[in-house]
């Protein structure tokens, strides 16, 4: 065992039984290496582990030096929103589909993780968005997002009329099916599908991408991440929502606005030493290879 990490948390809710084998293999291996290991409560229950330290995501964030998320990007997003509040590093073993955020190969995870535990890794900070539903600036409901905050109708698709203010200055009005407000991390997710630009993770920027706008002049907009975005609605409807990372939904009631800004804290995401963002883009998005 080395001094880079002493206490390691294992998190991630598996959707398939095969993913549990990765959790169990990782737990046994870390224990054999002499690390203190905390297992997320649900995982410990499903693995039927007895007499092992367990904890919630918040407890793991408070006690561990490193959290290993086993699963796909959805698992990473769900865990990271909580873990980002604490001084903990996070890395992912991909048991999902694309795996933009979980870049350890499950077939070689132990070797790659061994290198990381010995200090051979790349560290980066990813900022989050904070979304508030408020009335006359009195906060009523709040959540955070690693990828994006999306304004959309609730149950039935329909056109939304709204105004966008940047730092309390009117930016534009729009009639569309919604709006995607994305971080650089989320620029390769829902935002990309809607025609938004890809932003490298180190950029301090936020993108605003319209969803099916009812005018050809509506285009994606990139603003500084220090800006505050306010959404106001011309026709008050009770079926509007904002969703955070497609996992948490906040309803918008009559007379309420939405405020979106960069969080005060960030996610400490680490990668293997040979990680390359552009290699990941090429592999995951099927970009063409070099010509010469």
UniProtKB/Swiss-Prot annotation:
Keywords: ATP-binding, Cytoplasm, Kinase, NAD, NADP, Nucleotide-binding, Transferase. GO terms for cellular component: cytoplasm. NAD(+) binds at residues 73-74, 147-148, 158, 175, 177, 188-193, 247. It is an enzyme of class 2 (transferase). It is found in: Cytoplasm. Its cofactor is a divalent metal cation. GO terms for molecular function: ATP binding; metal ion binding; NAD binding; NAD+ kinase activity. Its EC number is 2.7.1.23. The active site is at 73 (proton acceptor). Belongs to the NAD kinase family. This is NAD kinase. The lineage of its organism: Bacteria, Pseudomonadati, Pseudomonadota, Gammaproteobacteria, Enterobacterales. The gene is nadK.
